[in-house]
Amino acid sequence: MGSSKSSKKDKQIHPFGTDVSTFRKLSSKEKKKLDEKELKQYKKLKHKVKKLKKEERERSSIKNTKTLAEDPMVKNVAENDHDQMKNSLSRSQDKGNTDYWLAASLSGGNQRKSKFLKMLGIKNAASITESSPSAQSNKTNDKQREKELEQQYMHGVLHKGTKKGLGM
């Protein structure tokens, strides 16, 4: 009799398939028709299918990256990009990064400017901190800008909480 039970299990046809290759998703109506054991089997099989698909995607992405890495044209382009990056970095270091941080535009003495540049890690800070004529002409513009900012700040303080101009 024990053999007859196992043969009945083997003979059962599941609507979702018996292995990963024959798996198909079931609709909610079909899931409701399944008993508890069949539902557990369905969930296990669904999990296996998801896992296999994920592994296949990872394998294919690894294969794609390997083929790109083996391609001589891609290697040449990558080497050229790397060389260009090295050249641009060396040029920016030679300039002392003055393109990004202009110490001459800072207000204060040379000691303060050199300290600022040292904190940023810029070499040859002494040559950069020398004030240029353009920086001196900008001082009047800076004073005017500061005056306007102070006026705007005071205007904001006075009108704080009045809810004017907000469409309310």
UniProtKB/Swiss-Prot annotation:
Residues 29-95 form a coiled coil. Residues 1-35, 48-97, 126-168 are annotated as: Disordered. Residues 157-168 have a biased composition (Basic residues). The keyword Metal-binding does not apply. One of its GO terms (cellular component) is nucleolus. Residues 68-85, 140-150 have a biased composition (Basic and acidic residues). Keywords: Coiled coil. Residues 126-139 have a biased composition (Polar residues). Induction: Differentially expressed during meiosis. GO terms for molecular function: RNA binding. Disulfide bonds: none annotated. It comes from the Eukaryota. Transmembrane segments: none annotated. This is Uncharacterized protein tam10. It comes from Schizosaccharomyces pombe (strain 972 / ATCC 24843) (Fission yeast). The gene is tam10.
